[in-house]
Amino acid sequence: EICACLVGSEMCIRDRKREDGSSMFGYVRIRKPELLVKDYECYKGFYCGLCHSLRDTYGLRGQVTLTYDMTFLVLLLSSVYDLAVKEEHKRCIIHPAGKRRVIRTEAADYAADINMLLSYYHFVDDKQDEHSLAASLGVQMYRGQSRRLEQHYPRQARAIAEGMQRLHLLEQEDCRNVSALADCFGRMLAEVFAWKEDGLADFFRETGYYLGKFIYIMDAFEDLPEDTHKERFNPYLGTDRRELLPQVEEQLLTEIAAAGAAFEKLPCLEYRDIMRNILYAGVWNRFDRIKQELQKEEQ
């Protein structure tokens, strides 16, 4: 289901939860207590900028695909390519009371386009798995824009389509090889992160690949109780999360360390502190919360 909600004074578009339980979005975000106020305000500006790019190009159907994950990509591309920044203060339907800082670069438009492609292929995957009315409507709603974007970004679109199809086939085979499953999502994000085919493309691919693997593993671990209850696919089915905790933590550390090593090779000119906060702290927000909950259960 897609919905918009207010969290305190901030707008949060709740990530669409796939019928099979794996939205695989929402993990790549800041850890607010460890971020300087000026950096937090900057991050919010980029988040709002992406939201406005989605709305201006695609309307509400674009705006509801907004994720924190793509905000990281906008920051990364804007920093490495030293993109021109357009900063404004605007009102919006979510924040009608006052104007909000909105920071936009060319990378926001790219991320908005990729968000639409990802949304379309997630609906296609849902339709394959569940044959639900919601998925069918989603495919119809996003198909037209997707066709145009496939022409504009053939490499990225092909990687997303092939990655989702490989993932679907492995799930149909009841594959329990987490690394093989995560590889599918990693390959998708690798091509998404490589905006341009230049001398930096391989470093972007490496960052996206390992971050994608981290996201898949984290998502499977978080969704295990719900997937078990609803008898949905999950590579960790049949194992208690408390027993899995050390193994999953080691897997996640391996992937995020590799993502961080690739990220540090990129010549980031600005926003480095924000991105390091995300990569080395924020991505662990949900895992740390689950870990605390499991520890409380044992007491």
Predicted regions and their residues:
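A glycine-rich phosphate-binding loop feature that marks nucleotide/adenosyl-phosphate handling sites
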Residues: 277-281
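Short, flexible loop/turn segments with low-complexity composition
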Residues: 272-276
